[in-house]
Amino acid sequence: MLTKKQSELLRFIHERLKETGVPPSFDEMKEALDLRSKSGIHRLVMALEERGFIRRLPNRARALEVVRLPDAATPPVPPHGRKFSPSVIEGDLGRVRPHTPHTDDEDSELTTVAIPVMGRIAAGTPISALQHRSHTIGLPMDMLPAGEHYALEVRGDSMIDAGILDADTVIIRRQDNAENGDIVVALIDDEEATLKRLRRRGASIALEPANSAYETRIFGPDRVRIQGKLVSLIRRY
């Protein structure tokens, strides 16, 4: 269910697209909804996108598309429907497509992607695999490589020498392979997830901590599935 402001913004975008074929600017949205700042509009846009009412299109200024209205009988068209199987993560992920940077301030505000926070990841003893997102965070596309991404909250101190601390939020690019030395989300025996540095030792896979207080764990290749590679980190002070 949408809030009053979310519904008003969705209707405004829909009507403007019908009239002109071009979505309204953030300033026009702000004025139409009588808000004081564009940051409020940004949050509303993110909420509508997360709920499947609008979609952002790559490589186009003001690239907003209305997918459905609240009273529509048809379900929203999923922008990306692939899932991990089997996996530590399920559901739609934040997708970043190759893009060219915008120079216009207004356009750059629309080049933000909603990244789902899928729970906690152990940087210590592996914890049970997590599959349900708790909320989303908005990140500029320029911060991320192309691909699908998700975020995890770090629990533990086994990666502190790599600059990854307890309570950090790590941004993971979804992929099922990685290079030697990459920091990855590894799913062990389809049950436990951990954040470690990947090392290949012959036919075995070593999951290496970045803290001398922890031991490297070695597994056969059939016991470890790569769920993604670390690409960014967020820390709150």
From Swiss-Prot:
UniProt cross-references to Pfam families, sorted A to Z: LexA_DNA_bind, Peptidase_S24
Active site: 158, 196
CDD domains reported in the protein's UniProt record: S24_LexA-like
Single Gene Ontology MF annotation: DNA binding
Site feature Cleavage, where: 123-124
Key words of the record: Autocatalytic cleavage, DNA damage, DNA repair, DNA replication, DNA-binding, Hydrolase, Repressor, SOS response, Transcription, Transcription regulation
Gene: lexA
Enzyme class, UniProt record, top EC level: hydrolase
GO biological process: DNA repair; DNA replication; negative regulation of DNA-templated transcription; proteolysis; SOS response
Protein name: LexA repressor
Organism: Beijerinckia indica subsp. indica (strain ATCC 9039 / DSM 1715 / NCIMB 8712)
PANTHER family assigned to the protein according to its UniProt record, in alphabetical order: LEXA REPRESSOR, LEXA REPRESSOR-RELATED
Catalyses which reaction(s): Hydrolysis of Ala-|-Gly bond in repressor LexA
Its biological purpose: Represses a number of genes involved in the response to DNA damage (SOS response), including recA and lexA. In the presence of single-stranded DNA, RecA interacts with LexA causing an autocatalytic cleavage which disrupts the DNA-binding part of LexA, leading to derepression of the SOS regulon and eventually DNA repair.
UniProt record similarity statement: Belongs to the peptidase S24 family.
